[in-house]
Amino acid sequence: MEDFVRQCFNPMIVELAEKAMKEYGEDPKIETNKFAAICTHLEVCFMYSDFHFIDERGDSIIVEVGDPNALLKHRFEIIEGRDRNMAWTVVNSICNTTGVEKPKFLPDLYDYKENRFVEIGVTRREIHIYYLEKANKIKSEKTHIHIFSFTGEEMATKADYTLDEESRARIKTRLFTIRQEMASRGLWDSFVSPREAKRQLKKDLKLQEPCAGSPTKVSHRTSPALKTLEPMWMDSNRTAALRASFLKCPKK
């Protein structure tokens, strides 16, 4: 699973996921299913945000990569992926500027068009149950919830899906492709079932025991299927800015 994640996702997303796990004392090399889930969630958050801007009249518009619209304001502020202190700083700044109610839990995005925080969910389980769990945890009508599944289903607060159909279809297609690629490598069942994942982990650890001290040969080749899987949606200029913003070390 770890090799699949590193091949499948944008390097910046992998780096952010590793950083988030280490912040909570988790090891991406051991908890590989969680590693994959965090990368998937991060990618959906970025895809949700990318190409969506607000023009000078306050209207939401879609701008594809390469268009000369650098002065447009991004519609969504990305909160997910930042370290907790920085994330709360961003949330507090938004609340102070807009007057919106401060959430009890860190949301994933802020929508400047609708003036609301957004909680993004990506589930391997039954979507209605997952939505109810999210809503029960957040306990706030001010935070908008939008859930996607790997089967192409989605569910949102008051059936308000925020994005246009094409943008949502891009997210659903990406999730379905990830599922198919996992399945073709025999990874999907353990990704869906925690019990199966634990069994697979024990099996992997047992296989590693006899050669723990041996050097590991790593292949850096990417299969043709993974080349098509590599996300092409990220705006290169924004990627660089996000990397600088999200990954910079805090000053001591």
Swiss-Prot record:
<feature type="site" description="Important for efficient shutoff activity">
    <location>
        <position position="202"/>
    </location>
</feature>
<dbReference type="Pfam" id="PF00603">
    <property type="entry name" value="Flu_PA"/>
</dbReference>
<keyword id="KW-1132">Decay of host mRNAs by virus</keyword>
<comment type="similarity">
    <text>Belongs to the influenza viruses PA-X family.</text>
</comment>
<feature type="site" description="Important for efficient shutoff activity and nuclear localization">
    <location>
        <position position="195"/>
    </location>
</feature>
<keyword id="KW-0945">Host-virus interaction</keyword>
<dbReference type="GO" id="GO:0075523">
    <property type="term" value="P:viral translational frameshifting"/>
</dbReference>
<feature type="active site">
    <location>
        <position position="108"/>
    </location>
</feature>
<comment type="function">
    <text>Plays a major role in the shutoff of the host protein expression by cleaving mRNAs probably via an endonuclease activity. This host shutoff allows the virus to escape from the host antiviral response. Hijacks host RNA splicing machinery to selectively target host RNAs containing introns for destruction. This may explain the preferential degradation of RNAs that have undergone co- or post-transcriptional processing.</text>
</comment>
<dbReference type="GO" id="GO:0039694">
    <property type="term" value="P:viral RNA genome replication"/>
</dbReference>
<dbReference type="InterPro" id="IPR001009">
    <property type="entry name" value="PA/PA-X"/>
</dbReference>
<dbReference type="GO" id="GO:0003723">
    <property type="term" value="F:RNA binding"/>
</dbReference>
<keyword id="KW-1035">Host cytoplasm</keyword>
<feature type="site" description="Important for efficient shutoff activity and nuclear localization">
    <location>
        <position position="198"/>
    </location>
</feature>
<keyword id="KW-1190">Host gene expression shutoff by virus</keyword>
<keyword id="KW-1048">Host nucleus</keyword>
<keyword id="KW-1262">Eukaryotic host gene expression shutoff by virus</keyword>
<feature type="site" description="Important for efficient shutoff activity">
    <location>
        <position position="206"/>
    </location>
</feature>
<feature type="site" description="Important for efficient shutoff activity and nuclear localization">
    <location>
        <position position="199"/>
    </location>
</feature>
<feature type="active site">
    <location>
        <position position="80"/>
    </location>
</feature>
<protein>
    <recommendedName>
        <fullName>Protein PA-X</fullName>
    </recommendedName>
</protein>
<keyword id="KW-1192">Host mRNA suppression by virus</keyword>
<feature type="site" description="Important for efficient shutoff activity">
    <location>
        <position position="203"/>
    </location>
</feature>
<dbReference type="InterPro" id="IPR038372">
    <property type="entry name" value="PA/PA-X_sf"/>
</dbReference>
